[in-house]
């Protein structure tokens, strides 16, 4: 049996969130942060490998309220710093600006952690390089939040581009999480069932597509 159920890899974000009504909140965020809390609160033994400028962000303290989480902090000379302006109450439409990003993860800085699932939960393309996927697959089942392959920081903003290496790398992926818009970028299909079938044919074993109805 593995020491941990999940190892979640990704940078934390220093977020400024402006709601549609003008309410402004400064917070720690990011996929690793929210996924870490969610996994821990299901009872999973969870390890997280967050990355940030540790002079600015206390990574252990950020996760301290979560049960069952072991933190392996990594230092970057820069952090992921962003501002999100939400235009609708459901937060589906937003404008994001990015002040800085982390130094990319490197395979050689990943500790020897025994986990059943390695969940790659970055925030922008390049933060978790493509070579991390086959590396992770040699250690565990691989889960990916595909935003880390589609969202690019350009001119201080976030734009989406297709994942050029998707057909090469999806066969390494056991669990693929995408939203409906990201699934359309990947496959060209607006129909979620068709998109899921295409992603499965390209090699992902289990696909979760989130959406608002």
Where on the chain are the PLM-derived regions?
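Active-site metal-binding loops of divalent metal-dependent hydrolases
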Residues: 10-12, 31
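Short amphipathic alpha-helical segments and helix-helix/interface helices
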Residues: 36, 60-61, 107-110, 129-134, ...
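Conserved phosphate/ATP/ADP-binding segment of small-molecule kinases
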Residues: 152-213
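Conserved N-terminal subdomain of the carbohydrate kinase-like
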Residues: 3-5, 14-26, 41-121, 126, ...
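Flexible, glycine/proline-enriched loop segments at strand-loop-helix junctions
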Residues: 115-124, 148-158
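Structural detector of well-ordered beta-strand residues that form the stable sheet scaffold
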Residues: 142-145, 208
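Short beta-strand/turn micro-motifs composed of small residues
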Residues: 10, 50-52, 146, 211
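Short catalytic helix/loop segments, enriched in acidic residues and glycine
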Residues: 24-37
């Amino acid at each position: 049996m593995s020491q941990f159920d999940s190892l979640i890899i990704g940078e934390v974000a220093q977020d400024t969130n402006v709601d549609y009504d003008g309410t402004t909140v400064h917070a720690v965020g990011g996929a690793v942060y929210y996924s870490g809390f969610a996994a821990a609160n299901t009872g999973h033994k969870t390890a997280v490998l967050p990355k940030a400028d540790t002079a600015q962000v206390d990574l252990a303290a950020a996760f301290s309220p979560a049960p069952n989480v072991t933190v392996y902090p990594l230092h970057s000379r820069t952090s992921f710093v962003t501002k999100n302006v939400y235009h609708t109450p459901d937060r589906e439409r937003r404008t994001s600006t990015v002040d800085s990003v982390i130094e990319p993860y490197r395979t050689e800085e990943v500790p020897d952690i025994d986990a059943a699932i390695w969940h790659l939960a970055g925030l922008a393309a390049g933060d978790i390089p493509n070579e991390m996927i086959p590396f992770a697959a040699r250690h565990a089942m691989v889960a990916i939040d595909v935003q880390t392959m589609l969202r690019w920081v350009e001119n201080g903003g976030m734009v989406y581009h297709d994942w050029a290496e998707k057909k090469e790398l999806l066969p390494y992926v056991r669990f693929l999480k995408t939203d409906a818009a990201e699934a359309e970028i990947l496959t060209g299909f607006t129909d979620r069932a068709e998109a899921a079938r295409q992603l499965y044919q390209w090699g992902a074993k289990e696909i979760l597509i989130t959406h608002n109805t």
